[in-house]
Amino acid sequence: MNNDFNLLILSGPSGAGKSTLTKYLQEKIPKTHFSLSTTTRKPREGEVDGLHYNFVSEEEFKQGIEKGQFLEWAIVHNHYYGTSKIPVEKALKEGKIVIFDIDVQGHEILKKHYPNACSVFISTKNQEILKERLLLRGTDSKETIEKRLINAYKEMQCLESFDYLIINEDLEKSKEIILSIAKTLVHRLKAFNFEKICKAWKNESL
């Protein structure tokens, strides 16, 4: 199978539920690899370096850019975010499903690298619900939340570039949907080697 058919990109506004759904997929599908993003922002309360993100200084991040260590990178809310190349390529060679939790900018760049990747946009029903979730999370200032809401509106204008949309109103239902999508990845027809399959069906007596 072609490796890039095992890529699942999750995008959407902060607070829509991407992290929760990613964690669920990792619990339900043993052979997965979560692509840990590298960022220059400070850890939120409860976040662990190397578990939730790779936290680095701006200088370290820029050095990584110069060395070509990132598949994609972008500046979001005045912080650098990027996807490291080596762990992703290693996981693909091992036949794992690689899951990305990245923004819309990152999605566009990754699709250029991996055109067969499957992408899912995850959102709340409307802006008011997203604002409520961000306020309840209690990790951002009011100013930061306003910036996130403005950015979320901009991201919603890019929906047509994604393969699937999940309006995350009912978490259990959203879990079922994302699991179904992930399980179908390796069974898409374009992922198969047709020549190999046809050879297996060859009948010398015909």
From Swiss-Prot:
Residues 5-183 form the Guanylate kinase-like domain. It is an enzyme of class 2 (transferase). One of its GO terms (molecular function) is guanylate kinase activity. ATP binds at residues 12-19. GO terms for cellular component: cytosol. Disulfide bonds: none annotated. Keywords: ATP-binding, Cytoplasm, Kinase, Nucleotide-binding, Transferase. It catalyses: GMP + ATP = GDP + ADP. Gene3D superfamilies: Guanylate Kinase phosphate binding domain, P-loop containing nucleotide triphosphate hydrolases. It is found in: Cytoplasm. Its EC number is 2.7.4.8. PANTHER family: GUANYLATE KINASE, GUANYLATE KINASE-RELATED. Essential for recycling GMP and indirectly, cGMP. NCBIfam families: guanyl_kin. Belongs to the guanylate kinase family. This is Guanylate kinase. It comes from Helicobacter pylori (strain J99 / ATCC 700824).
